[in-house]
């Protein structure tokens, strides 16, 4: 068993889907080996007396037989299986669980709504970057969890009896996507939310994070349609109108919405609109992890780091043997440039963080080959698991690294949606200049420079005589000015 002792598994018997996550512990963080998800729709098998139908239980057991095969290689002490809302509710849950334990060969724990909310929050805290004070929303099949917290500590936990499967059965049973069905679903959701809204608002939040299939589906729709990844009430209302326009559930077609998610999408959307309205949420982003990640990190007893992005960057630098001193050097020059033009260009703090992150990884492509290093870097960053970074932020980092040198591919900077295209162009310019001026790989050879921005014109002032004393540097900067001019980025160097 020794060789497999670094493997851990978390299984979540949800009301809509059963999920299994298998990971390996590597140097204080986790590497995902397997993710299996099966739509079981257990909640749909509850009758008016809250008894699970034999068909629903059989669907669940069939799924667990698949999971059991994978669990044979993992020590039982490193497996956690939890059941949530539907099995909390079902009067015959004992029958289902007895057979489930027999199939899996390990205990199945029915957790309370509050414990579910706590675990979801831990999963988010371990995997999601951004501000420390957060509101986490998870819309499940039969329950919705709402949690506020700061860092690793929760400040309020609520598990509410509404979910995308139960709301589907209750308000969209006729499969009609009319305004009246949405109104009824939203009104009911707001009534469920009202008793807890004041306490959630009292604790407050700086960022709101969504950790469910509904939010994942929204993210996929927005990425497919070229929008930025921030979920707003305006976007939710637009999608609702699109759904109403489709008329019926079986005719629901939205760019980016998969067939698998379509069935419970309208009910999840109605609940999310109610949450946004009742709590006056301005904007929400997708979490990096939730319940299963919370279970895994709980088994590993790993502390929540203050800055998840920094941990991720450190791990990647070690793994790909990136020259950390050089990465820091480039980051320092880039930060200096950013601070000098920040006001004129109206740049936000998150843009600075993403620029510094790009600097930390800019030489990752060398681990493949010097030839086409920027392309290798972009490929690696696009495809690596980067906890703390959203999918859109990963795409921006990859795009910046692709354009760190050589002629600029303007279209790629416009295809990312983490920041506006103009901001992506500006960050790219700063990264390219920082790499040039730190290229001698010594702190004492980085010149004192001032960088001024006047609209899109950048004026770089070097120490007197520097260009004369550094003929190669002069040639590289002349080439860079030319490349930037090709894409209408004026650069003057004195």
From Swiss-Prot:
It comes from Escherichia coli O139:H28 (strain E24377A / ETEC). GO terms for biological process: guanosine pentaphosphate catabolic process; guanosine tetraphosphate biosynthetic process; nucleobase-containing small molecule interconversion. Catalyzes the conversion of pppGpp to ppGpp. Guanosine pentaphosphate (pppGpp) is a cytoplasmic signaling molecule which together with ppGpp controls the 'stringent response', an adaptive process that allows bacteria to respond to amino acid starvation, resulting in the coordinated regulation of numerous cellular activities. Gene3D superfamilies: 3.30.420.40, Exopolyphosphatase. Domain 2 (3.30.420.150), Hypothetical protein af1432 (1.10.3210.10). This is Guanosine-5'-triphosphate,3'-diphosphate pyrophosphatase. Pathway: Purine metabolism; ppGpp biosynthesis; ppGpp from GTP: step 2/2. InterPro entries: ATPase_NBD (IPR043129), GppA/Ppx_hydrolase (IPR050273), Guo-5TP_3DP_PyrP (IPR023709), Ppx_GppA_C (IPR048950), Ppx_GppA_N (IPR003695), PyroPPase_GppA_Ppx (IPR030673). CDD domains: ASKHA_NBD_EcGppA-like.
């Amino acid at each position: 068993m020794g060789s497999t002792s670094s493997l851990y598994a978390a299984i979540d018997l949800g009301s809509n889907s059963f999920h299994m996550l298998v990971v390996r512990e590597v140097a204080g963080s986790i590497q995902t080996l397997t993710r299996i998800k099966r739509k079981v729709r257990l909640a749909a098998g509850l009758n008016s007396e809250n008894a699970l139908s034999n068909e629903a239980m059989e669907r669940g057991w069939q799924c667990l037989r698949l999971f059991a095969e994978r669990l044979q290689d993992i020590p039982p002490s490193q497996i956690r299986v939890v059941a949530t809302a539907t099995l909390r509710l079902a009067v015959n849950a004992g029958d289902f669980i007895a057979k489930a334990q027999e199939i899996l060969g390990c205990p199945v724990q029915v957790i309370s709504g509050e414990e579910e909310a706590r675990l979801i929050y831990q999963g988010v805290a371990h995997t999601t970057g951004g501000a420390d004070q957060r509101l986490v929303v998870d819309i499940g099949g039969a329950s919705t969890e709402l949690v506020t917290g700061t860092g690793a500590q929760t400040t309020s936990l609520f598990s509410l009896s509404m979910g995308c499967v139960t709301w589907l059965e209750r308000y969209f049973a006729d499969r009609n996507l009319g305004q009246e069905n949405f109104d009824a679903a939203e009104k009911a959701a707001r009534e469920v939310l009202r008793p807890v809204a004041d306490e959630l608002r009292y604790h407050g939040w700086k960022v709101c994070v969504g950790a469910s299939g509904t939010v994942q589906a929204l993210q996929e729709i927005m990425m497919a349609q070229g929008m930025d990844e921030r979920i707003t009430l305006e976007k939710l209302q637009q999608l609702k109108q699109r759904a109403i326009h489709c008329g019926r559930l079986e005719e629901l077609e939205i760019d980016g919405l998969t067939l698998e998610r379509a069935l419970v999408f309208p009910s999840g959307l109605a609940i999310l609109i109610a949450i946004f309205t009742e709590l006056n949420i301005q904007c929400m982003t997708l979490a990096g992890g939730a319940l299963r990640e919370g279970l895994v990190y709980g088994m590993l007893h790993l502390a929540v780091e203050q800055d998840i992005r920094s941990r991720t960057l450190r791990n990647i630098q070690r793994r790909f043997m990136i020259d950390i001193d050089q990465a820091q050097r480039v980051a320092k020059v880039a930060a200096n440039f950013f601070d000098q033009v920040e006001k004129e260009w109206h740049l936000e703090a998150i843009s600075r963080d993403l620029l510094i992150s790009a600097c930390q990884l800019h030489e990752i492509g060398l681990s493949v080959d010097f030839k086409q290093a920027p392309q290798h870097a972009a490929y690696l960053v696009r495809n690596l698991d980067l906890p703390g970074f959203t999918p859109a932020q990963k795409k921006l980092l990859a795009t910046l690294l692709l354009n760190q040198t050589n002629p600029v591919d303007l279209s790629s900077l416009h295809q990312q949606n983490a920041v506006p295209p103009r901001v992506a162009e500006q960050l790219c310019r700063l990264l390219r200049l920082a790499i040039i001026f730190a290229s001698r790989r010594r702190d004492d050879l980085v010149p004192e420079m001032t960088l001024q921005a006047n609209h899109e014109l950048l004026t770089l002032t070097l120490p007197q005589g520097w260009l004369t004393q550094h003929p190669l540097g002069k040639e590289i900067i002349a080439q860079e000015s030319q490349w930037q001019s090709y894409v209408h980025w004026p650069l003057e160097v004195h």
